[in-house]
Each structure stands twice: as structure tokens, then as C-alpha cells.
Amino acid sequence: FPFLMEERRVCRVLLLGPPGCGKTTVLRDAAKRLAGDGIRVSVCDEREELFPEDAAQAGLDVMRGIDKPTAIQMLLRAMSPQAIFCDEIGDMRDVRALLDAARCGVGLAASAHAGVFDDVLHRPVLRALYEAGAFERYLLLGRHGKLAAAYDAEGKPISGGGIEHEKRRGDGHDFAQRDRLCSGGRRNAPRPLGAGHAPNPDADKRHDSL
């Protein structure tokens, strides 16, 4: 699982990809692998899709059917996780919960529907996470769950890790075009966590079904 670990520390990673590309499977396998390596992994499985079966044998602490804000707070207080895995990000309440976890120094792994990295900047919920510096890495899945591209916290491509290097629209190489995607002709650069930046809870009052 390239780009997920850095010197025994679990990074904050957002897994991107179209529906049906295998995001859930990749998250499930990664959580099991980390737990097998002795890392304390907790799972927020709101939709009961990540671990519908008993996860105790995998050494995971799983909370099923509970909304992410509630589950993440309970996991942080009770389980002392080194990493929290959760299913697809939904709305601004999820954003705030993930930022709380990130500021506690916990590794994160979550997923969201996106065909290309630039979709992150077009969707208010994902853009709020990007601008707040919630994730250190963005991993884009291609066909059959293969890693098609990887980006750092600023959206710059990362090489290595078995990336397929598929040539796709908006693959992150036209930074001038990406800068124009945001209102006013420019985007807000990601800020380090703790820099005083908070997402606007009114940015997306509707549920952004990912």
C-alpha cells in the first residue's frame, strides 16, 4: 500500500475514484494489513460496507451504523487509535470530524467519488478538506482498483509506488488551469493543520452525496 506509511507513521490519505473502482476493497485490505503489523486501527463504518463481517479477528475496532462525527469522537476517546479508517465522506459535519482527528495526530484514510483530482476543487466538501490541509496525500484509483495517480497535499503529482500513469483529463499537470477553477481566478493553498483555518459550515448545507 504505497504512500500510506511514512517511517511507521500512518499518513492522512484520501482515496479517490469513480464508483465501482474498488475504493472500499482497498481501504478494507489496507486496514487489515496495518492491524496485522501491530498498528492500532479503528474503523468508522457508517454505511456498514467496509466491514460487514466480524472484524475482531483482524484486530480492528469497528463502529458500524453510527454517523462519522459521533463515531470518530468515541474512537478517539476510547480506543487511542494510531489510524482511523472511514467510509465515504458525506457533508461538512464529516469534514469537521476528520479535521478534529487530524489535529489529534491520528492517521486517516477515507474515500470519495472523483474521476480526476480536479474534482476535489469543484466539490465544496472536498475542497474544504483540501484547503484545511486535512490530507497529506490523494490517491486516485483507475481500472480494477489500480493506482492511477498520487498527489501531495498541494495537489502536485507524486511518482513511484506502481502508478499506472494513465493519461487522463485533469490529471494534475496543468496547474495554471487548476488555479482558474476556484472563484476569483485563484484557489486557497492548503494550510498546515492548526493554522487557524476552519471550514465554513454554510459552504454546503445540503448533503453532498459522494
What is the role of each PLM region?
Residues 6-8, 34-36, 54-55, 75-79, ...:
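Conserved catalytic network of the ASCE P-loop NTPase/AAA+ motor domain
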Residues 174, 179, 200-204, 208:
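Intrinsic-disorder-associated, low-complexity terminal segments enriched in Asp/Asn/His/Tyr and depleted
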